[in-house]
């Protein structure tokens, strides 16, 4: 980031915004997402409304929590730009056909082993991304929490777990395969199944510009059709 930069414009979709978050990192420079992609939940703003809103001061800056991950017992393979932070989520996923046995501890307390395709650790920002598709809760971006969400668990009693921002989450797996897939937002890498992963809240937050006419609830309704009931012709 060039010194003196006031803001970063991320022009594209949410994937572009995630890539921009890596570039901005802990610089404190805010990001404004301009939607030229598909869904545009993080990049929710239409190009024609951005300039007027910025010039008139009709915007605010919100903090978005980030995840920090530490890999033990292996070096990540498959990515040349390894960066241990994520805005949405960190995941561990099986690389083959066999289900994983996933051992998780939260601040040293062991959870029951998850027998599943994988595991998601998400921020409140990530609660409307992969975690949502896996059945996780929706959390306001102002909520400084972590979501632990198994992917396709082979257990009817498993539910997502929400833990506080101070939690330290340790993950290890039992696998018949030699490797597992680890993702951090839109970055993918391969890890040996003997590796372990520690995930916690990062010490810095991402600054995101939100236009005044927008809100988290409005984005849920307009982008994800939250609460819409087609039986009543979309009436609220």
What are these regions (language model features)?
Residues 14-16, 39, 125-127:
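Short glycine-rich anion-binding loops that position phosphate/pyrophosphate groups of nucleotides
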Residues 19, 23-34, 41:
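Gly/Ser-rich helix-loop-strand patches that form or flank binding pockets
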Residues 104, 126, 182:
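Short aromatic-centered micro-motifs
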Residues 1-5:
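Short acidic low-complexity segments
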Residues 84, 92, 110, 159-236:
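ATP/nucleoside-binding phosphotransfer catalytic cores, i.e., glycine-rich phosphate-binding loops
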Residues 113-157:
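Gly/Ser/Thr-rich active-site loops/lids in small-molecule metabolic enzymes
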Residues 39-117:
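Catalytic core of DAGKc-family lipid kinases
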